[in-house]
Amino acid sequence: MIKFHFTLIFCFAFFLSYGGAISNQLSNDIKTGEIKVNVKKIAPEPVKWDTEIRELIFDDDDELKDGSHFMELFTPYRAADAAIVPISIKFRKNQNEEDFVKYITIVADENPSPIIGKFEFSLKTGKSDFSTRIRIDKYTYVRAIAEMNNGEKYMVSNYVKAAGGCSAPSLADMDTVMARLGKMKMKLIETGEVGQLNKAQFIISHPNFSGLQFNQLTRSEIPAHFVDSIKVTQDNETILNITSDISLSEDPSFTFHYLNTGGELDVTVTDSQGGVFSNKWPIEQILSSK
């Protein structure tokens, strides 16, 4: 009993000495937004990746290296909307002839179709940073896998808390969605003279139905209807070539870079129901519409 009382007194004294400081520090961290959480410590083991998905993409003898020394994946830890989850990939160096990113594969382990898309780059891309928006079906690891021109493969991943994105209804009614199908917009975010690195954003109006959604009026299933390829060129040189599946968000959007050679930007999009959409934007036309 004496030992118990001594322990209680010691704990009380410790709280008086340090409790206020801990409380004040926590309060300050909350106010300044500087609370840091080590996601790797609280995220679950990547069981599905280890047992199922890795072998869908790679051969057994493929070496997959940690890419955190030269690339970074940005995702929300907890997404505000699982149907529109923003992701960005940034690299610490530009494309060059000796060492450049050839492909990036985006994966969400727990999605019904885990391979979200494969993005092909070239020296014309200049810099392989890009951003897009994806659907997430349940809490999952999101991965970016870069394949270099020499065949080496690197991966970075984040754990994202989001659910229901693959079956979430469209943002508008069916008639409105289909009326604007295939409409495109190109926006220059950064532009310069010929030979300089430009940055642009491309958006296409498309429902990107996953096949898991229901018509909100009839409650009938909506067949899958999604963008499955996008190709962006300038002066007959490929800037970006995308092969995608059901996990891109409605109205797919991509931000990308390219080395400007002065010609118009040419985009061709196809979808899973045979739709083909194309458009061209002279640089001057894009600049005048800014």
Predicted regions and their residues:
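Bacterial N-terminal signal peptides
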Residues: 7-17
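Low-complexity, Pro/Ser/Thr- and charge-rich linker/hinge segments at domain boundaries
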Residues: 37-47, 163-185, 286-290
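N-terminal edge beta-strand
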Residues: 54-82, 175-194
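Short edge beta-strand/loop segments characteristic of extracellular beta-sandwich folds
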Residues: 74, 86-95, 199-207, 215-220
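Beta-strand signatures of extracellular beta-sandwich domains
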Residues: 103-107, 229-233, 268
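Aromatic sugar-binding surface patches on proteins
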Residues: 123-131, 246-257
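Surface-exposed, short loops/turns at beta-strand junctions within beta-sandwich domains
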Residues: 133-139, 257-263
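Short acidic/polar inter-strand loop motif in beta-rich domains
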Residues: 148-155, 271-280
